[in-house]
């Protein structure tokens, strides 16, 4: 089942400030949600988003998921660290708090999977899912299908 969540004014936490966390944040920015990033290291892109006031950053090193105790009202929690064990602890803790959770390194353990989205000028939105099993295949299908749909809509 593919669901399009309304994240307006919802609290979303991304744990991990590397390339995977940044990729997930890029997709969240247009949703008008309140994004908090927790990480001890951040890439330049995330630092620039913080300067623009688009995200809040809590710079800290995590060894476990106990920091979630201070953020109980998170609608969505994305675990995107480079530590599979920590990501699993974050997902388990977040789930116990009633949040939707996602582990970037283990979509099968997550409450949802990311789809490959085609959005054509606010006219059409198509989601392609492999149920988290093959994001690369979903991306290839999206690229081919996007070209076809653009040609149809532009006629």
Where are these predicted regions, by residue range?
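Conserved SAM-binding strand-loop segment of SAM-dependent methyltransferases
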Residues: 55-61
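Hydrophobic beta-strand scaffold residues
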Residues: 35, 57, 100-101
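Short acidic/histidine-rich motifs immediately flanking catalytic phosphotransfer sites
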Residues: 53, 71-76
């Amino acid at each position: 089942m593919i669901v399009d969540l309304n994240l307006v004014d919802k609290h979303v936490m991304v744990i991990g400030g590397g390339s995977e966390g940044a990729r997930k944040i890029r997709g969240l920015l247009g949703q008008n949600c309140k994004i908090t990033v927790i990480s001890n290291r951040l890439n330049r892109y995330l630092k620039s988003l913080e300067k623009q006031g688009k995200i809040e950053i809590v710079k800290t090193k995590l060894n476990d998921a106990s920091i979630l105790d201070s953020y109980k009202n998170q609608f969505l929690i994305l675990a995107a660290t480079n530590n599979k064990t920590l990501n699993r602890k974050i997902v388990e803790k977040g789930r116990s708090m009633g949040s939707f959770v996602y582990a970037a390194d283990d979509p099968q353990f997550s409450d949802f999977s990311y789809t490959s989205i085609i959005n054509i000028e606010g006219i059409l939105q198509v989601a392609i899912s492999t149920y988290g099993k093959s994001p690369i295949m979903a991306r290839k299908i999206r690229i081919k299908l996007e070209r076809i749909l653009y040609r149809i809509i532009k006629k």
